[in-house]
From Swiss-Prot:
The family this protein is said to belong to: Belongs to the protein-tyrosine phosphatase family. Non-receptor class dual specificity subfamily.
Top-level taxon: Viruses
This protein's name: Dual specificity protein phosphatase OPG106
Active-site residues from the entry: C110 (phosphocysteine intermediate)
Function, as annotated: Serine/tyrosine phosphatase which down-regulates cellular antiviral response by dephosphorylating activated host STAT1 and blocking interferon (IFN)-stimulated innate immune responses. Dephosphorylates the OPG144 protein.
Length: 171
């Protein structure tokens, strides 16, 4: 087995058959200005203690937040095993990086705050990694976020796409 196949096997195996996690209900602060949440968190964003500048909506449904100065960015993504989310990684991670640098709080969400938004958050954190071992960093981030939130990037296709871009292609 070559190195890339071994890494992919180990990463998918170590994150695949875990006990079923409970869906998260609370918003999670990921970095100083990047937050991960669900649809309900987005609907409550205008009244949140955090003064969000942006909401990144990754659901299929477009919406507005009445009486709010929050800018909504909509990327309609389907949560299934055929959706290619990797084509959005570079743009989303660059956007989240700018929000962090400019101190502009952003809430990234999908319906449950697990797969689509979790994948983009994981991609963002992986893109910031300057460590020499992306495989270990992936496992650290994945399991840390799962411990914090419960369910986190349960879609095997989304995990595979992140592993291919940020772990396999880095080695």
């Amino acid at each position: 087995m070559d190195k890339k196949s071994l890494y992919k096997y180990l990463l998918l195996r170590s994150t695949g058959d875990m006990r079923r996690a409970k869906s998260p209900t609370i918003m999670t602060r990921v970095t100083n200005n990047v937050y991960l949440g669900n649809y309900k968190n987005a609907m409550n964003a205008p009244s949140s203690e955090v003064k969000f500048k942006y909401v990144l909506n990754l659901t299929m449904d477009k919406y507005t937040l009445p009486n709010s100065n929050i800018n909504i960015i909509h990327i309609p993504l389907v949560d299934d095993t055929t959706t290619d989310i990797s084509k959005y990684f570079d743009d989303v991670t660059a956007f989240l990086s700018k929000c962090d640098q400019r101190n502009e709080p952003v809430l990234v969400h999908c319906v449950a705050g697990v797969n689509r938004s979790g994948a983009m958050i994981l991609a963002y954190l992986m893109s910031k990694n300057k460590e020499s071992s992306p495989m270990l960093y992936f496992l650290y981030v994945y399991h840390s976020m799962r411990d914090l939130r419960g369910a986190f990037v349960e879609n095997p296709s989304f995990k595979r796409q992140i592993i291919e871009k940020y772990v396999i292609d880095k080695n």
